[in-house]
């Protein structure tokens, strides 16, 4: 039975997906979360995601897609022997790029959702992130949305609330949703597996910190 007012969120326990989780709770009467283990070096993010979902009273499911880590040995998030790029290379993507990850996540999420009668999928991808990952682009998401509908003869809708937001605007959205403090203190964005403010020097932490400072400055100026 189709549930038109239900959504499944691709959830990792990081800043973006946590913001999306609460965005979904605002827009849908029933929300579930799916988290993926894909051979990432830091499994703490799974426990963080599980706790946030439980505290938010959101059903949580973990799927094992660790085969991804066997397909490409050149990603620093899944291969501990590779030193992480601190800056984006001029002619390529940083080695934090996991080829096909969002395609796999959304495909498995759609199959899982279909079995639950859910046809709204929510993901925290954004074109505004520094990395320029190809599977975070709006054109990719729209293309995959069409493909999933054709593949299963269904009418899925993939929602991307953060697509055009930079990190400062993601912080702003979390504030509007009333979860700013939760996102700031209870999420895990750091590539080195450090909670909240993180390690401070990996690309994810730099992006998060810069966005926070930009948002707080803008908020202060608007209150004058």
Curated annotation (Swiss-Prot):
Binds 1 zinc ion per subunit. One of its GO terms (biological process) is queuosine biosynthetic process. It comes from Parabacteroides distasonis (strain ATCC 8503 / DSM 20701 / CIP 104284 / JCM 5825 / NCTC 11152). Its cofactor is Zn(2+). The lineage of its organism: Bacteria, Pseudomonadati, Bacteroidota, Bacteroidia, Bacteroidales. Belongs to the QueC family. ATP binds at residues 11-21. This is 7-cyano-7-deazaguanine synthase. It catalyses: 7-carboxy-7-deazaguanine + NH4(+) + ATP = 7-cyano-7-deazaguanine + ADP + phosphate + H2O + H(+). PANTHER family: 7-CYANO-7-DEAZAGUANINE SYNTHASE.
């Amino acid at each position: 039975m189709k549930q038109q007012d239900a959504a499944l969120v691709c959830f990792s326990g990081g800043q973006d997906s946590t913001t999306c989780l609460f965005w979904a709770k605002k827009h849908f009467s029933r929300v579930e979360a799916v988290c993926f283990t894909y051979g990432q070096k830091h499994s703490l993010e799974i426990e963080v995601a599980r706790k946030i979902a439980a505290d938010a009273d959101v059903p949580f499911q973990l799927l094992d897609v660790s085969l991804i880590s066997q397909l490409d040995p050149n990603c620093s998030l899944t291969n501990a022997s590779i030193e992480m790029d601190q800056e984006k290379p001029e002619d390529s993507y940083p080695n934090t790029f996991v080829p096909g990850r969002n395609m796999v996540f959304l495909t498995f999420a759609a199959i899982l959702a279909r079995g639950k009668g859910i046809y709204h999928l929510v993901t925290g991808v954004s074109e505004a992130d520094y990395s320029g990952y190809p599977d975070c682009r709006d054109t990719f998401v729209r293309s995959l949305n069409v493909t999933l509908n054709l593949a299963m003869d269904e009418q899925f809708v993939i929602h991307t609330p953060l697509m055009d937001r930079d990190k400062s605007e993601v912080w702003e959205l979390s504030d509007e949703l009333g979860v700013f403090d939760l996102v700031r203190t209870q999420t895990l964005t750091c590539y080195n597996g450090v909670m909240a403010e993180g390690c401070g020097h990996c690309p994810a932490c730099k992006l998060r910190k810069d966005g926070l400072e930009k948002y707080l400055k803008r908020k202060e100026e608007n209150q004058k």
